[in-house]
């Protein structure tokens, strides 16, 4: 059985919104506040995670974001991400933008539960906050890998919103 692994970059106060500053969020770009040594360690962790993954699971916006940036890149990490099977959850997309991708439609919980039954390894979810919240609501997340950045953003989209069900 596959395992859903949520891998997120988060600030100290839990914000996941616009870490690179490319989405127009006024507090975006907090990812860039780490030093070169930390960036190298982060890149190694991300590569190791990608090498250990069987597939990626993404929401529509994350598929679009990643495809726009990764399709033209090369190197160990880019090559691995581009070659991994990808599953994009969407009610509007017919053709995902990133290569080697399949669209999952219909009931999200049912589609992801079926995917977990079909695969054996880690199914890594990058970004995709709305999708992650849906997965949490249906108790489909098996593991959280949160890379906490040493900054307080103050406002923005948080992975764990107040009043949400407990995530174990």
Model-assigned labels for residue ranges:
Residues 1-168:
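Enzymes that bind and transform nitrogen-containing heteroaromatic metabolites
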